[in-house]
């Protein structure tokens, strides 16, 4: 792992950032990682991990100070996601989803909305981002959830699926179509639904291949009433807000995938240094060394690209959608390659739950699917080269 230790050492962190990362490292080593196998086996929401994250104030690092936060750089946030995901992928995505759901409110919400809704998240509340429906996955314009104005309220009817944190969230950022707008793209709007809103119901939780400690809910909105003041922006602003928010959440998913990949790479190389066949360590076979060289190089390139992208975002860049797609696609692809080889290098042991690589392989797959499938990202990247 010398090359990755060197990359980490070369990252320039302020004293405050380094102090926080040291605290995160202790948190993951002492609390989050030791809980990971139990959480996965039980399929239990990791409340202890969430409470530990809250004690450290990690939600506050992406919330502006005016609303109870203690903001730090996007690059630092990604480093935190990477560390938590390396220790426990379920906890990593629970934490990252808070950012995914609240960033649109931070960027596009009114002063009144941010003052009213953000402090709960900064102090440790949970958030969810509700976009996907049975008929609307990669194509968000197919969503059928409807927002009907009624005086000083908006009445919501519809359903969402695959919503991370959906059953436990204090705030749900919900996308739907505003009544009275015929164009399916221009009708998309977004509002905040608060926990306990009348007409909001959790229909059930998915039983998943991986990320078993992270709850994935199906939600129904049956005449659900929320204040009209919870609408972010104007009716019809939702698609622009959605696309802008995805450009921020995709680097977050890349960091999450890199965390999983790092855990698998560490376990694989440690095992290969110990395991012997035909009197030799399996790491001493040339074919295995070639495989490690390819994986290590690709993982390092994914990390460096993500660092580059985070630097652009921290510098105020606004147009980085293609770079974000590249980061998410490449990081999730290399994560799946690494976990596959890690299981292979462990032989039969890798297929057994006594070894972490079994869980990591299950956890890695979804990173190629959520926040836009990698097929969609390849299309977005390739299409960007077409002349108009």
Predicted regions and their residues:
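Alpha-helical interface subdomain recognition
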Residues: 1-87, 91, 108-111, 124, ...
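Short Ser/Thr-interspersed hydrophobic loop/turn segments at strand-loop and sheet-helix junctions
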Residues: 57, 81-85, 193-198, 222-225
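N-terminal glycine-rich flavin-associated loop
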Residues: 89-112, 137-140, 148, 153
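A short, Trp-centered hydrophobic/proline-enriched beta-strand micro-motif
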Residues: 123-132
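Short Gly/Pro-enriched turn/cap motifs at secondary-structure boundaries
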Residues: 135-138, 162-165, 181-182, 208-215
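Flexible, small-/acidic-enriched active-site or ligand-binding loops
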Residues: 142-144, 196-227
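A short core secondary-structure module
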Residues: 153, 157-202
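A short, charged helix-loop
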Residues: 217-244
């Amino acid at each position: 792992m010398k090359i990755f230790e060197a990359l980490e050492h070369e990252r320039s962190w302020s004293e405050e950032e380094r102090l926080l990362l040291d605290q995160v490292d202790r948190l993951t080593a002492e609390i989050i990682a030791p809980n990971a196998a139990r959480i996965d086996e039980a399929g239990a929401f990791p409340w202890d991990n969430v409470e530990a994250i809250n004690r450290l104030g990690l939600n506050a690092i992406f919330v502006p100070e005016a609303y109870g936060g203690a903001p730090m750089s996007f690059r630092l946030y990604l480093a935190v996601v990477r560390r938590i995901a390396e220790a426990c992928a379920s906890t990593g995505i629970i934490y990252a989803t808070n950012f995914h759901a609240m960033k649109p409110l931070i960027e596009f919400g009114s002063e009144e909305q941010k003052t009213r809704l953000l402090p709960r998240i900064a102090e440790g509340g949970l958030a969810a981002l509700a976009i996907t429906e049975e008929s609307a996955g990669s194509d968000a314009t197919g969503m059928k959830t409807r927002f009907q104005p009624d005086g000083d309220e908006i009445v919501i009817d519809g359903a969402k699926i695959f919503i991370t944190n959906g059953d436990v969230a204090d705030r749900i950022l919900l996308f739907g179509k505003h009544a009275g707008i015929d164009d399916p793209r221009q009708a998309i709007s977004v509002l905040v639904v608060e926990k306990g809103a009348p007409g909001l119901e959790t229909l059930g939780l998915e039983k998943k291949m991986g990320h078993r400690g992270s709850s994935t809910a199906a939600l129904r909105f049956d005449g659900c009433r929320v204040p009209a003041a919870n609408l972010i922006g104007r009716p019809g602003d939702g698609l622009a807000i959605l696309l802008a928010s995805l450009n921020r959440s995709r680097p977050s998913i890349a960091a999450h995938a890199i965390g999983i990949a790092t855990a698998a790479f560490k376990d694989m190389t440690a095992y290969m240094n110990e395991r012997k066949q035909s009197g030799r360590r399996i790491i001493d076979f040339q074919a295995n060394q070639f495989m490690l060289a390819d994986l290590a190089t690709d993982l390092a390139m994914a990390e460096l690209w993500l660092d580059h992208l985070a630097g652009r975002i921290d510098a105020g860049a606004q147009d980085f959608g293609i770079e974000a797609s590249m980061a998410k696609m490449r990081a999730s692809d290399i994560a799946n390659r690494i976990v596959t080889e890690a299981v292979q290098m462990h032989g039969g042991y890798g297929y057994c739950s006594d070894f972490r690589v079994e869980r990591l392989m299950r956890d890695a797959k979804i990173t190629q699917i959520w926040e836009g499938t990698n097929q969609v990202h390849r299309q977005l990247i390739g299409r960007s080269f077409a002349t108009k």
